[in-house]
Each structure stands twice: as structure tokens, then as C-alpha cells.
Amino acid sequence: MTNVRIGVMYDRDWNPEGLPEFARRAEALGADDLWVVEDLGWNGGVTGAAVALGATDRLRVGIGIAPAPLRSPALLAMELATLARVFPGRLVAGIGHGVREWMVQVGVAPRSPLALLEETITSVRALLRGERVELTGREVTLDGVKLVHPPTEVPPVVAGVVRPRSLELSGRVADGTLIAEGHGPRDLERIRELTGKGGAGPDHLMTVFAFACVGDDPDEVARTLHPHTEGHGAWLGRPQDEVFTVSGDAPGAADGIRELAAAGADTVVLRFVGEDPLGQLEAVLGAARPPSA
């Protein structure tokens, strides 16, 4: 399994002071990526990325995701450019709609979420390329804004989206699509069709988040996953047993990663549940990448 990147999520419920050591250990175990989360009231995504990047030497760090309504495109581009210059080639920036209820809660719910996301991604990418941006859109206005220190290596900007129109938007304006937990190989085929409808080419990145639980007792694995698959099944509008997970013993979990890779995933980011997430990561990496591979 040489073509797919294997990453790990630093879960939002884990305290921020634990991030540096977790990132260093994930890197030492051989993970390709570490992804941080930005949900209202939890940890900041850009600051979390900075912490993880500063604690490691090789690990690529993703932000999954910065909610467009909470972020000025100019300020977001400034922050991303700073990270990309200091840590070239090691950043992926995810931008999404944000949870509607949370955006209402803080008074930033847009009139048109689709317009805001498209205008934000388009302007952030242009600013990161060093362009002077003039935009009078439905949701975003930028009057001749230009970064003084754009990155020499522009980081990918990916859209964290779920619904069909948003997936088409991602194919039209983003470098890739970030796919939420619970989506399996058959979903990836549909997602690829929708991003392709928006204009995505073969280089459009597909990053998949997946709930993961590695253990030798199948009943215990199922019990550990249950509250997560139940909640996500309700969110996705599908039966719980159709919520895809990377789970089972280490070889079985590695097979789950292979299935996603065969369906087009470029990166699989494991969101471990249960005890000892780094031990689980070590086990699945050992099965996915045996020494003889």
C-alpha cells in the first residue's frame, strides 16, 4: 500500500497541551499526516496546525476544517501563508461551510453558504498565489488585497463538504475534497462523479476521514464504535451498519484503508476511538506497511 497517505486525527476532545507530544509520536510511528479540527468551542484549527508543525520535522498537517463564515478570507490567507512559508510543503488547508447551528449561534450565518464558500476558497487560493484580489461578490468583498509575503510553495486548499451542490463546487474551485467520516468506497465513486461534474480533474485530491478502532475482540470493537456510528448514521441519513469504518484487528483495519484507496482516496485520516489511539495507529501502520513491503 504505497500510493495512499495514512494520517491520524487529533480529536477535538483531546486537550491542546497534548498535541505536541502526540504529533511527535505519530511522526515517529510513520504516519504521513496529522489533521487538526476546528469546531466551535473546541480548539483553534490554525493555531493547532502551527503547534503540530512546530513540534515535528516531516509530518504533513491538515486543517479540517476552517469554517468560512468564521474567517475573513484575507486573514485566513495571511495565517496560511505564514505557516506555508515557515513549513513549506507540509500544510493542507481545509475550508467548509461550518455547522449551520453554530454559525447562527455566533451571528455569522451567511445568506448564501454556497456563495460564501466559493468566494472564500477562490479568494484564498488567489491570495496564496500572490495575486492582487479584487472581488465584489455576494458574500465576500476584497478591494485590491495582496499578500506581502505569499508562500513560495502554495499549500493545497481543499473543501470539506458533503452535499451534491457543494461537491460540485469543490470540483470547480478547490484543489481537493475532504470527505467526512462514515463514507465508504461506493460513496467515493459518487463523490468523484459530482466533483468531476464541477470540473475536477484527475489531480483533484480526495482526503477521507474515517472512524477507526483496532482490536482483536470484534464485540468490543463494535461496542466502542457504536455511539459514533449511531450519531453519524443519523447525520448522514443512513442505517448505522452502513457507516463505513476502518476497524477490526490490524489486518482487517488495513484492508479498510486499502478499500478506500482502491476507490480513489489519496489520503485516509484515521479518527481513532477507544483506548490508546497511538497504539492502534502503530498496529494498523504495521499491518498496512509490513517491513517487506
What are these regions (language model features)?
Residues 1-293:
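Active-site-adjacent structural elements that line small-molecule/cofactor binding pockets in enzymes
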